[in-house]
Amino acid sequence: MDISELLAFSVKNKASDLHLSAGLPPMIRVHGDVRRINLPPLEHKDVHGMIYDIMNDGQRKVYEEMLEIDFSFAIPGLARFRVNAYNQERGASAVLRTIPSKILSLEELNAPKIFAEFALKPRGLVLVTGPTGSGKSTTLAAMVNHLNENEYGHILTIEDPIEFVHESKKCLINQREVGPHTLSFNNALRSALREDPDCILVGELRDLETIRLALSAAETGHLVFGTLHTSSAAKTIDRIVDVFPADEKEMVRAMLSESLQAVISQTLLKTKDGTGRVAAHEIMVATPAIRNLIREAKIAQMYSAIQTGSGVGMQTLDQNLTDLVRRNIISGAAARSAAKSPENFPG
């Protein structure tokens, strides 16, 4: 089987990831579980050859020098794939994550209605957070698509690597990938402010300088979408502030309290019928009360403010989990595994 056939099999079986690992058969992750494909183990030369087949010369050079690489590529008519190629003690390995060629709309994702409002904010910072594989990219792509279909403007994305490819609809869209199109998130963000964007998507707020530039862009009148690997709104605020040295923390809290629009923290759970996964969200809207808590570093009080903020579209993760259990979409056990207060989900 060549890599194209393996990827076609992976997509057909609705796998999120294809794992190629020297010494083992190919494996796919379906609805969160890793399963073996009924094929003989791959040798190092097999995996190495498959990886090289989908790389260009520049990527091969990086892989040889750095021993690992992130990149994306497409098979026309099938899907795009985000690839991490690396080495382990048995030899070459790679993980190929499927990026569907069709960008799902917010409606198709059954996303809360307020996500559409976040997508059309004229300025400010909207963060989508959660662990790896929680669907952050899918949610953000749907929000960017909503903006693209409803407003006239310029959307600039900075990604590592480019995942969903957007067509320009009402908006002009320019997508830049770290590596081929820019040397770093920081360089691209500095340039972005001179590229007349209305909206900037930053693939990952991974260090102090990127966070500083994203905050600055949001403060100067741009809509900025970004992701972090945090599991709640409170942890997101703490993570951003903690990156900065002590003498800057107060200034960062002030900037964040003025520019933040919303934090969506999401996780994916198996559906009760076992046929797929569903996203559960904590949603924090930057109301005057929330802005005040950020400014005054009263992050511990944020959870109760979200709990009582349903009138403006806020919800805690546990409130959303309760609703999903009540609607028979997920089991009590699945809710318990993700809940902040598992004791509220007996059985």
What are these regions (language model features)?
Residues 1-347:
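Short, flexible helix-loop junctions that flank or precede catalytic/ligand sites
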